[in-house]
Every structure is written in C-alpha cells, then in structure tokens.
C-alpha cells in the first residue's frame, strides 16, 4: 500500500467517524429537507380554486415553519462540528468534504425554494379582479415570453389567441405587449404564473397592488444636473492653460509623425536590408555544391525566427525575393541568384563544398 492509498483510507475512516458522531443531526437534516420539499410541493401545486376551497388541499404554514427550524438546527450542528474539527485537525472541510458540500447544496436549494414560496403566497391574492391581473386573461405566456394586455383594450371583446398559426403579428401588438423580466434565463418551478412573479424584482412585488405597474413599463426619468454659473468664468482660464501646455508639448517633444503607406513600406525594406547586411557574403556557384540528402518537409513547421532571434534562411529568401520589393529598394539586377531547388516544393537540403 503506497502513501496515496493510505491517505484515502485515512480520509474514509475520518468521514465514517464524523458521520457516526453526527448520525442524529444528519437524520434530522435529511428528514427536515424531505418534509420541506413535500410541504412546498403542496403550496406550489395550489391554485386559486384550491385556495378558496379548504376541503381540497389543507395548507399549514406552521408545519412548514417547524420543518424549517429543524432544518436550520441540524444544519448549524453539522457545520459547527465540521468547523471545530477543521480547526483541530487542520483538514479542509473538517475531514468530510462530501458532507459539507451536500449540506451547502441543500441549504442553497431551500433558500431559493422559500423565496419562491414567498412570491407564490403573495401571488395567491393577485389573480383577483381588484388587486391585479388574472392569468390567461390579461397575462399570457407564449414562446418563452410573457404578454400583457394593453390597458386600452376592452375585455368584453373577443381577443386573438397566441398560437403558431396566427399570422397577423401587427394585430397582436394592438392587444398585447411583451414584459421584460429581470432574470430572463432564471429557471423557476411551477407554471408560467409562478415564473411571472418569481422573475419580478422585490420592489415590484411589494407594490404589486398598483395595477399600473403591470400594465406599462414606465419611461425612465431624465437626468438633471445642476451646474454652478461660476464655471462659465473659469472656462477661458482652463482653455488658456490647456493651449499653453499643448504648445510646449509640440515644441519640445519628439512625436512620431504618421507615415504614408509607401513610406512605411520603404522603411520596412531598409530594416530588412540592415538586418541582412552581415548575412550575405557573396554567391556560391551551384556546380560546387553537392546535395547529401533530401527530405520532404511539407508537414514540418518552419518557424520564422531561430532561438537566437535571427530570421531563418527560408524566411530571408522569401522576403528578399518578394515581388513587392523589386524596383523599389532592391533592383532586379542586384537580387542574388538562388538555387532552383529552393523555388520548388519545400525541401530540406544539406550541402558540402567539393573544393574543401
């Protein structure tokens, strides 16, 4: 058994001892978590008719609160033990990273679930005729978007249905307008009615009794800025200082002037010539060279620069013999005669001089 296997066995023994010590708290945590989900399912599945008729579904908020208290108590006990164990043995997550991760994930889920239940509870009264809108009458969900009925529409007339076969889109805009959600990509449980209230910011839910908030998106107010009148007297002073420093900069600084395309090309050619001045030491006749080996280099990458920072011979040959440079800085008569092999397909050559 190597040191890795021994470390895994040690961690497994520590996690087993930790879960044995926290057996009661873990069981209470799991039981409370399941009861919260079960009770929340009753709330989320409840419609307006169920809310009115208590004989269909019985909802008890006190039961849910007791489950939440048990969940929080067991959560604090587990996290407190792991934190104390972490400080004692100096191990990450108190020696049981899996348990700490599961507790954290369950806590986040319960918090989001309770937030959804709060919106759902507030929304239980809103489908009424006096406090808000009724879903599927002046609020419709189609194609991933919520559509609101325009305030000037008469509810007694026949309204167009939102479906894939309705072709007159312009007519729909006379009746409905889209609602911009605060979190378009947020996934919420329940039907579109729950998604509608779950995606609202908290400020809009608190004042949701105001029907105008649902009818229109108010235009943001104009930005008002108060500028003191004395700044009009300071503008010439600032302009004068700016012009003075600008003149000093133009007189004493060496700023590069913009180059034309032709001048930039000439400068590039001169730089290349200076870099190759010490490389070319005369031409070698092709008859005095003998190829030792030949290898196809189609698949071999050829870098532009060597490790010393110098350009490779192939790149130098390509630059010197570039048609763009002929007639400008390197006349055609001054271009060195290059072996014909270098002008064919890429190949690697090794040469030796017969005279030596």
Swiss-Prot record:
Q: Which UniProt keywords apply?
A: Activator, DNA-binding, Fertilization, Nucleus, Transcription, Transcription regulation
As for subcellular location, the record says: Nucleus
InterPro entries this protein is in?
Answer: MAT1-1-2/MatA-2/Smr1
| GO molecular function (one) | DNA binding
Record-level GO BP terms: single fertilization
Superkingdom of origin: Eukaryota
Q: Name one Pfam family in it.
A: MAT1-1-2
The DNA-binding region ranges are: 183-199
| Single GO cellular component term | nucleus
The protein's job, in short, is: Transcriptional activator that is required for post-fertilization events. It is required for the developmental events that occur in the female organ after fertilization.
Q: What is this protein called?
A: Sporulation minus regulator 1
The taxonomy runs:
Eukaryota, Fungi, Dikarya, Ascomycota, Pezizomycotina
């Amino acid at each position: 058994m190597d040191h890795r296997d021994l470390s895994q066995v040690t961690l497994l023994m520590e996690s087993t001892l930790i879960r044995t010590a926290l057996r009661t708290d873990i069981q209470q945590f799991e039981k409370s978590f399941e009861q919260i989900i079960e009770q929340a399912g009753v709330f989320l599945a409840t419609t307006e008719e169920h809310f009115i008729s208590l004989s269909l579904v019985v909802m008890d908020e006190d039961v849910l609160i007791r489950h939440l208290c048990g969940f929080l108590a067991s959560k604090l006990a587990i996290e407190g033990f792991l934190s104390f164990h972490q400080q004692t043995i100096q191990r990450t997550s108190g020696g049981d990273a899996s348990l700490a991760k599961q507790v954290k994930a369950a806590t986040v889920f319960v918090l989001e679930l309770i937030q959804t239940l709060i919106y759902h509870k507030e929304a239980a009264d809103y489908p009424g005729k006096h406090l808000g809108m009724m879903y599927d009458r002046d609020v419709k969900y189609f194609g991933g978007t919520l559509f609101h009925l325009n305030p000037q529409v008469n509810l007694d007339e026949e309204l167009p249905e939102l479906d894939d076969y309705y072709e007159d889109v312009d007519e729909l805009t006379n009746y409905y307008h889209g609602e911009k959600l605060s979190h378009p990509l947020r996934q919420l449980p329940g039907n579109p009615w729950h998604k509608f209230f779950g995606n609202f910011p908290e400020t809009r839910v608190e004042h949701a009794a105001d029907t105008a908030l649902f009818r229109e998106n108010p235009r943001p107010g104009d930005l008002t800025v108060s500028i003191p009148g004395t700044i009009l007297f300071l503008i010439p002073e600032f302009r004068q200082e700016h012009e003075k420093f600008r003149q000093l900069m133009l007189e004493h600084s060496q700023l590069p002037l913009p180059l034309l395309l032709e001048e930039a090309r000439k400068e590039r050619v001169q730089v290349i010539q200076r870099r190759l001045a010490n490389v070319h030491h005369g031409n070698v006749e092709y008859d005095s060279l003998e190829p030792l080996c030949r290898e196809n280099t189609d698949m071999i990458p050829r870098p532009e620069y060597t490790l010393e920072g110098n350009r490779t011979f192939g790149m130098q040959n390509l630059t010197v013999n570039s048609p763009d440079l002929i007639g400008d800085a390197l006349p055609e008569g001054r271009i060195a005669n290059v072996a014909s092999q270098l002008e064919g397909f890429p190949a690697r050559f090794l040469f030796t001089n017969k005279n030596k």
